[in-house]
């Protein structure tokens, strides 16, 4: 009976160890995803400043303007700016 208890306890211990390892791995993966997708604090203000400058010269709606900051190749940041321009919207 003691021999059987020894093997059963060992199997139960493996299950709890595996679940703890899985939980820790999920925490690490969530942390890595968060750090990769985190936008800098200055991005909303930068967006507003760029819109102010653009609106001095052309009519730009919020829907026709988008700005994204992506990480490429580790520590290279790429600022992507998309603006829909229409000929009839140019200001004189």
UniProtKB/Swiss-Prot annotation:
The keyword Cell cycle belongs to this UniProt entry's keyword annotation: yes
Disulfide bonds: none
Keywords in alphabetical order: Cell cycle, Cell division
One record GO biological process: regulation of division septum assembly
InterPro entries, per database record: MinE, MinE_sf
Domain of life: Bacteria
HAMAP family, per the entry: MinE
Family: Belongs to the MinE family.
The protein's role, per its UniProt record: Prevents the cell division inhibition by proteins MinC and MinD at internal division sites while permitting inhibition at polar sites. This ensures cell division at the proper site by restricting the formation of a division septum at the midpoint of the long axis of the cell.
Protein name: Cell division topological specificity factor
Organism: Colwellia psychrerythraea (strain 34H / ATCC BAA-681)
Gene designation per UniProt: minE
């Amino acid at each position: 009976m003691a021999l059987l208890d020894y093997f059963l306890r060992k199997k139960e211990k493996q299950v709890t160890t595996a679940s703890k390892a899985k939980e820790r791995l999920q925490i690490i993966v969530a942390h890595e995803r968060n750090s990769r997708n985190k936008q800098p604090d200055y991005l909303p203000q930068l967006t507003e400043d760029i819109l102010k400058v653009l609106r001095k010269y052309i009519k730009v709606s919020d829907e026709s303007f988008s700005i994204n900051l992506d990480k490429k190749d580790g520590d290279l940041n790429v600022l992507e700016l998309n603006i829909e321009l229409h000929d009839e919207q140019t200001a004189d």
